[in-house]
């Protein structure tokens, strides 16, 4: 039985009962919906052995091939599988620990990710370190057998539902930019951490501010060495690109299918201009799929290929345009808000952020020109005094 057939059978048997209400839920723009139920689903998923399929067998995985993992992600999305509460742990933290962590760290952290009982969030962005991420100001100092952390993180997805956070902090006084950084693993349930949800115009609150006031992490909870924080942080982001993006594209396909269904029901499908835009959206989605498949032939150590640099700006712009298409298909009713936003209204509002988070389109263009094409770096302004 193929992995697709295996998962298909399991989803038919288990995405039922109380879990039926979170089918198609919990994806981008809807990540704060039914947190307790999605956490229960994550644990059920883990108990069935579906988490960490690509991991080596010695760490509880199945050494699943890349193409099998592609099929797995596509099949999960095809069933309307709920947005995974543990996706940050499985797709970002676990590969980083496997690639750069010690054996003790693997033994400590991988089981909680594998069984779905420990959820992770990402502590990168700060009020003055967003697109310019190397401007990190959060401080960490080693005191005895603990790191002591002071500072603030912002736009931290699902921090209020998580158990752990991985944090980039500055550990060497007097350093700037990418130098002197550490990559720490910090438990969230402690007196020195204050988590404040950010309520958005879309009505959701999946993002948070996280304040550290002499928060502590065990001395051994550092990935790599002092000064290697930037290298580890960038490698982690590289793990985002690959097979899991094909599952994301299946979710995009579901959104496009809903747009087409709506257009057929309200008669907007007869508009030649909208039909052309729907066709262009379909073509763009196919381009994304083929590019993602091509990226699978690249390295799996977190490094980024030229295609990887291009991928983010392409899908972010495509998804933003899809949100605008959704509003035009709804027509005048798009401006009417009932008790709860419709799925297509949520798509429009959330997709506006796609071109900002994880690197703005402007930053991505600089990266493509400088790193992928080898063009001269953009002149940077200087500060006098």
Residue ranges and their predicted role:
Residues 1-87, 107-115, 258, 265-266, ...:
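Amphipathic, small/basic residue-rich leader segments at the start of a protein or domain
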Residues 2-5, 193-290, 354, 385:
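Glycine-rich beta->alpha junctions and the first turn(s) of the following alpha-helix
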Residues 15, 65-67, 71-72, 92, ...:
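Glycine-rich phosphate/cofactor-binding loops in nucleotide/flavin-utilizing enzymes
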Residues 84-104, 130:
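N-terminal glycine-rich flavin-associated loop
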Residues 116-124, 168:
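A short, Trp-centered hydrophobic/proline-enriched beta-strand micro-motif
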Residues 138-141:
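A structural signal for short hydrophobic beta-strand segments in well-ordered beta-sheet cores
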Residues 145-146, 150-196:
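A short core secondary-structure module
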């Amino acid at each position: 039985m193929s992995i697709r057939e295996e998962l298909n059978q399991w989803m038919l048997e288990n995405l039922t009962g109380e879990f039926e209400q979170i089918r198609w839920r919990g994806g981008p723009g809807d990540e704060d919906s039914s947190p307790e139920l999605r956490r229960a689903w994550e644990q059920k998923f883990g108990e069935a052995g579906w988490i960490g399929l690509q991991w080596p067998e010695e760490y509880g995985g199945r050494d699943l091939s890349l193409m099998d993992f592609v099929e797995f992600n596509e099949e999960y999305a095809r069933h309307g599988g709920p947005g995974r509460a543990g996706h940050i742990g499985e797709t970002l933290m676990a590969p980083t620990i496997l690639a750069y962590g010690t054996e003790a760290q693997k033994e400590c952290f991988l089981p909680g990710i594998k069984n779905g009982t420990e959820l992770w969030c990402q502590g990168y962005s700060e009020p003055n370190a967003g697109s310019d991420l190397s401007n990190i100001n959060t401080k960490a100092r080693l005191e005895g057998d603990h790191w002591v952390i002071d500072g603030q993180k912002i736009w931290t997805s699902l921090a209020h539902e998580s158990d752990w956070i991985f944090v980039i902090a500055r550990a060497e006084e007097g350093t700037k930019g990418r130098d002197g950084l550490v990559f720490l693993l910090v438990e969230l349930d402690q007196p020195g951490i204050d988590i404040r949800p950010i309520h958005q115009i879309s009505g959701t609150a999946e993002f948070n501010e996280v304040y550290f006031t002499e928060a502590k992490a065990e001395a051994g909870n550092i990935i790599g060495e002092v000064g290697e924080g930037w290298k580890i942080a960038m490698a982690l982001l590289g793990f985002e690109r690959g097979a899991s993006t094909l599952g994301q594209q299946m979710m995009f396909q579901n959104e496009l299918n809903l747009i087409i269904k709506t257009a057929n029901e309200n008669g907007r499908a007869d508009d030649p201009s909208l039909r052309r835009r729907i066709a262009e959206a379909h073509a763009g989605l196919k381009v994304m799929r083929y590019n993602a498949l091509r990226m699978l032939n690249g390295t799996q150590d977190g490094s980024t290929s030229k295609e990887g640099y291009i991928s983010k700006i392409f899908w972010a712009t495509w998804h933003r345009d899809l949100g605008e298409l959704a509003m035009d298909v709804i027509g005048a009713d798009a401006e009417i808000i009932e008790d709860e936003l419709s799925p297509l209204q949520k798509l429009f509002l959330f997709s506006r952020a796609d071109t900002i988070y994880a690197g703005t389109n402007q930053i991505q263009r600089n990266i493509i020109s400088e790193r992928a094409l080898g063009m001269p770096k953009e002149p940077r302004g200087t500060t006098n005094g």
